[in-house]
């Protein structure tokens, strides 16, 4: 049967749909263009004229414009902008600790939120190397001669970041056999010196951990009970292995037991801890380490959930900074091989030496896993008696709302 393909009910249905779409389109155009009435607009608010005109290609100035220099500049400027945001978040967290606001535990969520934001930014910075790696070594070599003596080591913000988090000056790898600050002059040098004299995030977290509820000898006395349980558990473990028939497997288990025993008993040797602290192998005070371990073991308890998340974020930051350094090393090796850096350093070899625990700030938190024990060795708590697990400390004089935070 033939006929008009547009006859029948289908026409009404189609027209109806078109009518509905027209109505939706009309609704989408009912807004008001407030920008036309004057006032602050997008470009002015973001200062885009300054930002988007801040890319001066040295190759172009020298009369030999190289395309990939633009990518090189943009990528490093993006890094510096994100470093600025990280410092902004870090300074706000340090201020919360310094002013004693953490004594009101309601403020810990704000601390945790901002530190998590730093973690997310660092993840972005680690991934950002993949953009720069779209440039080949030959492409980079085309404009490298125009960069000297500029160097990534001269990033003031990254050095400030290291100092404010808590990188030990005594553990820094010398740059061309000089103190790192000697590569900065004037106001930059003074800013770095000031940042060395301020309380670091590590020191502030250390003081906070020392106040962990449950460490009090006349209270729950976690450390005393934990040591007692460890000694009892080790004795039971020894007798269990000793009761087995002589065999190669028994010898292996006994050797492993002795190693575990040495590690666990060293945990209760305060003098040894202080010695390792003086060498830079440990970073937290003895009591702060106790607090961190207590939070680690009781992380599922209501009062310790946010503190545990904070400790996890601190480890994430350390890990991501190490990954950032490593990615930087790999990129430099790929672009320069073993040649000297543009700033005069040994390049790849210098950068490679910075990818180590020397630059890890919260290394003690990573090492907590060394002290994992069977759950029944962990001191038990009675929630009826030990109400501190469910009763947070708060003080109206220490609490501040979002409006008062900055």
From Swiss-Prot:
Induction note: By dexamethasone.
Family matches, as PANTHER family: TRYPTOPHAN 2,3-DIOXYGENASE
UniProt record, GO biological process: L-tryptophan catabolic process to acetyl-CoA; L-tryptophan catabolic process to kynurenine; L-tryptophan metabolic process; protein homotetramerization; response to nitroglycerin
Iron in keyword set: yes
Pfam families hit by this protein: Trp_dioxygenase
Co-factor: note: Binds 1 heme group per subunit.
Function: Heme-dependent dioxygenase that catalyzes the oxidative cleavage of the L-tryptophan (L-Trp) pyrrole ring and converts L-tryptophan to N-formyl-L-kynurenine. Catalyzes the oxidative cleavage of the indole moiety.
Organism, as annotated: Rattus norvegicus
Keywords: Dioxygenase, Heme, Iron, Metal-binding, Oxidoreductase, Phosphoprotein, Tryptophan catabolism
GO terms of molecular function: amino acid binding; heme binding; identical protein binding; metal ion binding; oxygen binding; tryptophan 2,3-dioxygenase activity
Keyword Heme found: yes
Subunit structure: Homotetramer. Dimer of dimers.
Cofactor: heme
Segments crossing the lipid bilayer: none
Family statement: Belongs to the tryptophan 2,3-dioxygenase family.
Entry-annotated residues carrying Phosphoserine: 19
Pathway this chain belongs to: Amino-acid degradation; L-tryptophan degradation via kynurenine pathway; L-kynurenine from L-tryptophan: step 1/2
Catalytic reaction list: L-tryptophan + O2 = N-formyl-L-kynurenine
Residues annotated as binding heme: 328
Tissue specificity as recorded in UniProt: Liver.
UniProt-listed Enzyme Commission number(s): 1.13.11.11
Protein name: Tryptophan 2,3-dioxygenase
Positions contributing to substrate binding: 72-76, 144, 342
């Amino acid at each position: 049967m033939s006929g008009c393909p547009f006859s029948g009910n289908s026409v009404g249905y189609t027209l109806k749909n078109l009518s509905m779409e027209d109505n939706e389109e009309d609704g989408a155009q009912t807004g008001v263009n407030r920008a036309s009435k004057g006032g602050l607009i997008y470009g002015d608010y973001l200062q885009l004229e300054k930002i988007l005109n801040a890319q001066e290609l040295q190759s172009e100035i020298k009369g030999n414009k190289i395309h990939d220099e633009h990518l090189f500049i943009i990528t490093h400027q993006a890094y510096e902008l994100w470093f600025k945001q990280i410092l902004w978040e870090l300074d706000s967290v340090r201020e919360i600790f310094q002013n004693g606001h953490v004594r009101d535990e309601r403020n810990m969520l704000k601390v945790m939120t901002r530190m998590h934001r730093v973690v997310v930014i660092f993840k972005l910075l680690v991934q950002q190397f993949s953009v720069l790696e779209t440039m080949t070594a030959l492409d980079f070599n085309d404009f490298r001669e125009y960069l000297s003596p500029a160097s990534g080591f001269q990033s003031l913000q990254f050095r400030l970041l290291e100092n404010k988090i808590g990188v030990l000056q005594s553990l820094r790898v010398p740059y061309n056999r000089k103190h790192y600050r000697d590569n900065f002059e004037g106001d930059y040098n003074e800013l770095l010196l000031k940042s060395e004299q301020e309380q670091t995030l590590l020191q502030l977290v250390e003081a906070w951990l020392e106040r962990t509820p449950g460490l009090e000898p006349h209270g729950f006395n976690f450390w005393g009970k934990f040591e007692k349980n460890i000694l009892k558990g080790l004795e039971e473990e020894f007798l269990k292995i000793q009761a087995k028939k002589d065999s190669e497997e028994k010898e292996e288990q006994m050797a492993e037991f002795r190693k575990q025993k040495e590690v666990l008993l060293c945990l209760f040797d305060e003098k040894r801890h202080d010695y390792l602290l003086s060498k830079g192998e440990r970073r937290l005070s003895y009591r702060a380490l106790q607090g961190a371990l207590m939070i680690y073991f009781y992380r599922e308890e209501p009062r310790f959930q946010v503190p545990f998340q904070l400790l996890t974020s601190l480890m994430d930051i350390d890990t991501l900074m190490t990954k950032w350094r490593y990615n930087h090393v790999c990129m430099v090796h790929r672009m320069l091989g073993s040649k000297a850096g543009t700033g005069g350093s040994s390049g790849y070899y210098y950068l490679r030496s910075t990818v180590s625990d020397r630059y890890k700030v919260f290394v003690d938190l990573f090492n907590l896993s060394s002290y994992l024990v069977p759950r029944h060795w962990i001191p038990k708590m009675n929630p009826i008696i030990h109400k501190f697990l469910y009763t947070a400390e708060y003080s109206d004089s220490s609490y501040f709302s979002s409006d008062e935070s900055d």
